[in-house]
Swiss-Prot record:
Record gene name: glmM
Protein name (database record): Phosphoglucosamine mutase
Top-level taxon: Bacteria
Cofactor stoichiometry and binding remark: Binds 1 Mg(2+) ion per subunit.
Xref: InterPro entries: A-D-PHexomutase_a/b/a-I, A-D-PHexomutase_a/b/a-I/II/III, A-D-PHexomutase_a/b/a-II, A-D-PHexomutase_a/b/a-III, A-D-PHexomutase_C, A-D-PHexomutase_C_sf, A-D-PHexomutase_CS, Alpha-D-phosphohexomutase_SF
Post-translational modification: Activated by phosphorylation.
Source species taxonomy: Bacteria, Pseudomonadati, Pseudomonadota, Gammaproteobacteria, Enterobacterales
Role this protein plays: Catalyzes the conversion of glucosamine-6-phosphate to glucosamine-1-phosphate.
Length: 453
């Protein structure tokens, strides 16, 4: 298939005001997507659900999308700020033509993006995204005035989704004795996640739940848990839960302030499913998954397979294997027996149910999975030519791998959503040495970037 021009690993993303995140391009994207999605779904409902996170640019892009869809003859049903997985859920329950989310996930406020869901609440196939890109090359033509789309609002979207989330928590259990700190990253979960946990009985304290359009992910959320850790310790809470800007990722903190990442949550959920005789097959991780997770699952005789990085790759591998549970150490976890895409609230509820069901703390649930020291270093790279093709980078990478021997590994990759080279080094040695080795590779990559710019 031809290389895609606009779509990355998670929709279309970029800096607001620069191509492709401009009002004129997004309007045409709405038109092109409307034409293509109608074709693929057979025009069953004639409307598309649009949700967004809390970025100030969301209003502008929402209006542009709405106009483009109307020109293609499709109506827009607006939800306002809602988590990405909520749009996936609403799209399939409303039998909408498709769902669109305006969000750049964990990125800063000045970035934004567009991602699509099919009528089934799943990410679009490559074929559909390719067809949208072909349509974008055509001239925009408006339907007859009588066939123009309209806009409406789904007023009970939040309530519907809250009830859906609560329904994934065992009916015989309660969160009544738990004290939880919830960090909503000033993002799309701010009016959802606290309500879910409170309605299930938890004593909830919120932080980063006052979005103003420009504070999304700022010193909070899954990418910065310092504030959450401090509140958990100060309030003597049982645990803390952090979301990213659009709510498809979750990171937790135990009562000692220790970070609990996606790998540890995958282990907790898998073990609980195994004990309850509800585990289908094994677990799908990614190239970034910690060796500690692999070894812990092996102790339970649970199969483990790695996919490429990204929830799309995890989902593809789950489908291929016929399994239900997979995810990334970033906290993006997919539970296909519960929903169709990564959902931070639902994942947190499954971890909480394991705590309550076994009458143990989050810290105790993590006792049997010992993660190896792992470092992720990001190097900014806007160059079209990749420095990863350099002989010097390859030579340094090989030298580091030899130093780690069979006790570790190195992974270099270009991010699919941001202009960064990701350098992951993992090994069965002290943290300081892992950091030193990662920075050695980063230094060579930075030198190569300078030489090719």
């Amino acid at each position: 298939m031809k290389r895609r021009k606009y779509f990355g690993t998670d929709g279309i993303r970029g800096k607001v005001g620069s191509m492709p995140i401009t009002p004129d391009f997004i309007l045409k994207l709405g038109w092109a997507a409307g034409k293509v999605l109608s074709r693929f779904s057979g025009g069953r409902s004639n409307y598309i659900i649009i949700g967004k996170d809390t970025r100030i640019s969301g209003y502008m892009l929402e209006s542009a999308l709405e106009s483009g869809l109307a020109a293609a003859g499709l109506s827009a049903a607006l939800t306002g700020p809602m988590p990405t997985p909520a749009i996936a859920y609403l799209t399939r329950t409303f039998r909408a033509e498709a769902g669109i989310v305006i969000s750049a996930s964990h990125n800063p406020f000045y970035d934004n993006g567009i991602k699509f869901f099919s009528i089934k609440g799943t990410k679009l196939d490559n074929e559909v995204e390719h067809s949208i890109e072909i349509e974008l090359e055509k001239c925009l033509t408006c339907v007859d005035p009588k066939e123009l789309g309209k806009a409406s609002r789904i007023v009970d979207a939040a309530g519907r989704y809250i009830e859906f989330c609560k329904g994934t928590f065992p009916a015989h259990l309660s969160l009544r004795k738990l004290k939880i700190i919830v960090d909503c990253a000033n993002g799309a979960t701010y009016h959802i996640a606290p309500s879910v946990f409170r309605e299930l009985g938890a004593n909830v304290t919120t932080i980063a739940c006052r979005p103003n359009g420009v504070n999304i992910n700022k010193e909070c959320g899954t990418t910065d848990i310092r504030q959450l850790r401090a509140h958990v310790l100060a309030k003597k809470a049982d645990l803390g839960i952090a979301y990213d800007g659009d709510g498809d990722r979750v990171i937790m903190v135990d009562h000692f302030g220790n970070k609990v990442d996606g790998d540890q949550m995958l282990y907790i959920i898998a073990r609980e499913k195994l004990h309850c005789k509800q585990l289908t097959g094994g677990i799908v991780g990614t190239l970034m998954s910690n060796m500690g997770l692999v070894l812990a699952l092996k102790q339970l005789n649970i199969p483990f397979i790695r996919s490429n990085v990204g929830d799309r790759c995890v989902l593809a591998m789950l489908k291929k294997q016929g399994w239900n549970i997979g995810g990334e150490n970033s906290g993006h976890i997919v539970l296909l027996d519960k929903t169709t895409t990564g959902d931070g609230i639902i994942v947190a509820l499954q971890v909480l149910s394991a705590m309550v069901n076994n009458c143990v703390s989050l810290h105790e649930l993590c006792n049997d999975v010992s993660l190896l020291p792992q470092i992720l270093v990001n190097v900014y790279c806007s160059s079209i030519k990749s420095p990863l093709e350099s002989d010097l980078v390859r030579k340094e990478t090989k030298a580091v791998e030899q130093e780690l021997s069979e006790q570790g590994r190195v992974l270099l990759r270009q991010s699919g959503t941001e202009p960064y080279i990701r350098i992951m080094v993992e090994g069965n040695c002290c943290y300081g040495k892992i950091l030193y080795l990662a920075n050695r590779i980063a230094s060579v990559i930075r030198s190569e970037i300078k030489s090719i710019q």
